[in-house]
Amino acid sequence: MDKPRHDMQHTLDELLFLAGDQLVAVCQERVAALLAQPEYADPRRLERFGFKGYSQQDEDGILQEIFRRIDLGSGENARRFVEIGVGDGLENNTLYLLQQGWRGLWIDADQDRCAAIRARFAAPLAAGTLQLTQAIVNAENINGLIAAAGIKGEIDLLSIDIDGNDYHVFEALDIPGALSPRVVVIEYNARFRPPVKLVQPYDALYSWDGSDYFGASLCALHDLARRKGYVLVATNLTGVNAFFVRKDLAGAHFYPDTDTAALFNPARYRLIPGFDNGHLPGYGPYLLK
């Protein structure tokens, strides 16, 4: 590259870097302004605890606070997770936990992403602290996939994010029979505010097209979770994920489950840069102290 072109590229890179920093700063200011509103002041609410470790937005912090309030399970399945829809492994709801000594199962449909996981996470896969299943998840196979991994009974966390059949997969799971998660995280479609109850029709071969046609409304998921023995404790500030805790564990630790509308957060996807943590995600071993 000749010098004028090199200088121009360097200037462009600097401008893009500054623009990125400014976007993050603006989003962080908007997040702070939102959290200063009275409805988020109740100490039982969870939005203000949100932060991004490896999650897409603020889920890592919300989960950390949930488990602080209810404690972790005990026995052989303590600190164990199942996450359905994990991307390339570097941005999901359980990598932050894996780094802290948790163990569990990742399930994803994408062949290339699973290949990247096998390469990048070779050590925990070899040690057995992480299992990976490549499969297109549907209502018919989900129980078999989890059983084949040897996971049953109580686990601490189940996370579902497959951009379509989330409701139907959650409905099909043998809960509280074969599996009993203490906490469930599931994506909701924030297009539909309470009291709307809508669910995308089941299609085992559905593939998300990138639009807002996906999943289920918060109220529909809330009703399903109640039938399975769970209470709604939070949604995240960006309006992406809903958090449920098994009813026998919730106690008075959380905002009342009786008002879905109060716990609903609308779609604020443009706030996502506000949870940027400054570096591209990577994976490597750490020493637990």
Task: Give the location of each predicted region.
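Short hydrophobic/aromatic-rich motifs at helix boundaries and adjacent loops
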Residues: V31-Q37, G89, R191-P195
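SAM cofactor-binding core of SAM-dependent methyltransferases
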Residues: E47, F51-A148, G153, L157-I160, ...
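Short charge-dense sequence patches
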Residues: R5-L18, R44, D60-E65, N165-I175
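Membrane-proximal basic amphipathic "stem/tether" segments
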Residues: M1-E47
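A broad, low-specificity signal for short, low-complexity segments enriched in glycine/proline
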Residues: V24-V26, Q37, G61-I62, G144, ...
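Generic signal for short, ordered secondary-structure residues
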Residues: A41-R45, E76, A204
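Conserved acidic-Pro-Pro-aromatic motif
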Residues: A78, E83, Y96, W102-R103, ...
